[in-house]
Amino acid sequence: MRSIRSFANDDRHVMVKHSTIYPSPEELEAVQNMVSTVECALKHVSDWLDETNKGTKPEGETEVKKDDAVENYSKDQGGRTLCGVMRIGLVAKGLLIKDDMDLELVLMCKDKPTETLLNTVKDNLPIQIQKLTEEKYQVEQCINEASIIIRNTKEPTLTLKVILHSPLIRDELEKKDGENVMMKDPPDLLDRQKCLNALASLRHAKWFQARANGLKSCVIVLRILRDLCNRVPTWAPLKGWPLELICEKSIGTCNRPLGXGEALRRVMECLASGILLPGGPGLHDPCERDPTDALSYMTTQQKEDITHSAQHALRLSAFGQIYKVLEMDPLPSSKPFQKYSWSVTDKEGAGSSALKRPFEDGLGDDKDPNKRMKRNLRKILDSKAIDLMNALMRLNQIRPGLQYKLLSQSGPVHAPVFTMSVDVDGTTYEASGPSKKTAKLHVAVKVLQAMGYPTGFDADIECMSSDEKSDNESKNDTVSSNSSNNTGNCTTETSSTLEVRTQGPILSSQQVAKILCGANEKRRGLKYELISETGGSHDKRFVMEVEVDGQKFRGAGPNKKVAKEVQRTLEKLFSGPNAANNKKKKIIPQAKGVVNTAVSDAVQAVRGRGRGTLTRGAFVGATAAPGYIAPGYGTPYGYSTASPAYGLPKRMVLLPVMKFPTYPVPHYSFF
């Protein structure tokens, strides 16, 4: 089964070919004007004939009773000489193409059409046309075709055939022999077969409008095949009603809508299967009461030639050469791809070749994800400082406990507008936004502007520490809390102060563990709070806050001042009024220490490879806690117990390892 992409390629070719054979808007407008004008003129001719016939009646026959008014009106309508005009052929089916625009109308008559009636209509029709339009038309009669030929005198040149017909001709043929009543035909009766063909065309038009017009791509394929019949003499005998039947049966029997290319292939498959050949299923005419073969007029040789041509066209279509069937240039691919040339390098030798991309200067970094990530990180570091607190967070820090109220909600359901308000020092501020959160943010911006604080997402840094100035750090983030060392250099408020901080350092896992473990050893029960989280999934920035001795510390990344930040944090943690108490020697109970140390060391040795120990450098410079030995690296690579990698801490008592298999493991063991 062919892929969908090949069908899509066929669809493109078929639609491009269809656009070249479809009539232009000017041609379609000319057709519509000509057909409408002739139809209206024939209506006027019918009225003129009725008035002429009524003028010849006696005066006594014109008196009509009121009770018989409706009945006589219907009889008069049915007794008109010209009953009506209807479209047939290409005009009714919508199958007009360029250079093949045969226009046909059928003029229904009450009686059998005669040459006298034909001449009468032909003589009065130009007069009625002149009353309707200023355009010039040539009107001729064609007795052999039982029709009137009308041609326009300007471009595009169009020809319209009006065929006279009467239902009485078919009614006589359908009567049985016993019921047949010999009626004298007029001596100048028009060709009976031409009239019957016109009536058959009328039935074909009605059938086509009911069955084929609703099928997707059916009309398009018919126009394509009509063009093929005009170009290729082999296909000419199939042109007309048989071609319409084949297309309707081929496309209508599919259980889903077909595209133009697939529908054309399905018709070709149907013809290539041999339905036209003798002994095949044939083609039944659905518009005839008796079983009729619509291909009866074709010879055996013509059927074989069409079948052979359809098989050849099907092979071309299967190999992606449908443009040859349509006689058009191949279209370029809808999805062009980059072609790489095979090149032979001198380094690899003359006999080696590889598929290589052309080298493009300046794009090497884009190919390497690591370089691209570093470049993006550099852009972030060089860009403006990222505000870790928006206006709403800053206002809540300055004035905690503010109550925001929803004043109104307006706008449609898909685009609501919320209006929020807040009362600050007796002044009410209002702002609107597409959501409550956005409206609150807009209110906070207004309040900060009124209070004189910097607003926006990029706040100005009011003061900096001496260490930050020495590092020439140009990109900073504004956060809370001025340092106590800079109170003389910064103007602040006593109650609510905008605190300024720099971005936190980029810490490795070992450095983070060193700070956290040291803080947990010195200050038990510290609580860390997540202030904000920014950045994409590949570049997250977390702002954490911890309170030590009543002073809050915040850290965020990325930055380059790793060593200084760690040093300042450790100095704050291990200095101050509590430093002396921390350095005091603690008395370690001998018995309990021996037991706990033995148990901890034994368990540490049993853990084995694959179970990581405590973080590297976690207890460097810290006093050993009672009851267990601070392991440091403890078990490098997890093979066996070992001394700490950075040396043993001061004042640490070394005890021998003792094993007590029956002694229970204490519940506070750290493993």
Swiss-Prot record:
Pfam families: dsrm, DZF_C, DZF_N. It comes from the Eukaryota. Transmembrane segments: none annotated. The modification Asymmetric dimethylarginine is found at R611, R616. Residues 387-453, 504-577 form the DRBM domain. The keyword Signal does not apply. Ubiquitous. Residues 5-363 form the DZF domain. Residues 349-371, 466-497 are annotated as: Disordered. CDD domains: DSRM_STRBP_rpt1. The keyword Repeat applies. Keywords: Cytoplasm, Developmental protein, Differentiation, DNA-binding, Methylation, Repeat, RNA-binding, Spermatogenesis. It is found in: Cytoplasm. GO terms for molecular function: double-stranded RNA binding; microtubule binding; single-stranded RNA binding; tubulin binding. Associates with microtubules; it is unsure whether such interaction is direct or indirect. Interacts with EIF2AK2. This is Spermatid perinuclear RNA-binding protein.
